[in-house]
């Protein structure tokens, strides 16, 4: 499988500061296989050979996958239209998740790409509880309380664009709120 786009998306997430350090993870489903970032990896420094491979049942074929593997697998098992998952801890979205504030979709772009944002109550990172809460949501754009965001798409590019638009709309919400004082 050609993983050039996968690596490009990981590098973009890091370069644009949607992830820092070893935070965040990315996966792509192709047939019965899931290509996923390794645990503890820095997305900006990943190469194709670093990507882990797991089957949809959870059997590890290659590497040591992210601690959020269960979340990715549960999403794929419960949402057949999803082939890509991006999970980040972007600054503005995470700040709003900590404050438990809902975002307004102020722009046409946000309405088109995001449609509706789902909000997930706090669940500990890497747990089956988090995996079940996230995978049971109807929305493809999710804000996880005190944690970050998850965006879903039929392609990695689609999931990435949702991440980018969501962080921009969070920045816009912050600006609007500061003017409103």
From Swiss-Prot:
Domain of life: Archaea
Reaction catalysed by this enzyme: L-fuculose 1-phosphate = (S)-lactaldehyde + dihydroxyacetone phosphate
EC number: 4.1.2.17
Cofactors required: Zn(2+)
Xref: InterPro entries: Aldolase_class_II_sugar_metab, Aldolase_II/adducin_N, Aldolase_II/adducin_N_sf, Fuculose-P_aldolase
Pathway assignment: Cofactor biosynthesis; coenzyme F420 biosynthesis
Molecular function GO labels: L-fuculose-phosphate aldolase activity; zinc ion binding
Positions of the catalytic residues: 68
Binding site for Zn(2+): 68, 87, 89, 147
Entry binding sites for substrate: 24-25, 39-40, 66-67
Keywords from the named record: Lyase, Metal-binding, Zinc
Cofactor note: Binds 1 zinc ion per subunit.
GO cellular component, one term: cytosol
GO biological process, one term: pentose catabolic process
Biological function: Involved in the biosynthesis of the coenzyme F420 which requires phospholactate produced via the aldol cleavage of L-fuculose 1-phosphate and the NAD(+)-dependent oxidation of (S)-lactaldehyde. Catalyzes the reversible cleavage of L-fuculose 1-phosphate (Fuc1P) to yield dihydroxyacetone phosphate (DHAP) and S-lactaldehyde.
Family: Belongs to the aldolase class II family. AraD/FucA subfamily.
Subunit architecture: Homotetramer.
Name of the protein described by the UniProt record: L-fuculose phosphate aldolase
Organism field: Methanococcus vannielii (strain ATCC 35089 / DSM 1224 / JCM 13029 / OCM 148 / SB)
């Amino acid at each position: 499988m050609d993983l050039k786009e996968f690596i490009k998306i990981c590098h973009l997430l890091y370069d644009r500061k949607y992830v820092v350090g070893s935070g965040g993870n990315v996966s792509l489903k192709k047939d019965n296989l899931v290509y996923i970032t390794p645990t503890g990896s820095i997305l900006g420094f990943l190469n194709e050979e670093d990507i882990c491979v797991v089957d949809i049942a959870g059997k590890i074929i290659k590497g040591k996958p992210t601690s959020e593997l269960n979340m990715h697998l549960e999403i794929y098992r419960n949402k057949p239209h999803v082939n890509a998952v991006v999970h980040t801890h972007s600054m503005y979205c995470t700040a709003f998740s900590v404050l438990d504030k809902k975002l307004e979709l102020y722009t046409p772009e946000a309405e088109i790409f995001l449609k509706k944002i789902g909000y997930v109550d706090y669940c500990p990172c890497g747990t089956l509880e988090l995996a079940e809460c996230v995978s049971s949501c109807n929305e493809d754009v999710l804000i996880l309380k005190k944690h970050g965001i998850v965006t879903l798409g039929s392609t990695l590019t689609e999931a990435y664009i949702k991440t980018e638009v969501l962080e921009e709309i969070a920045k816009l919400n912050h600006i609007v709120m500061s003017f409103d004082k």
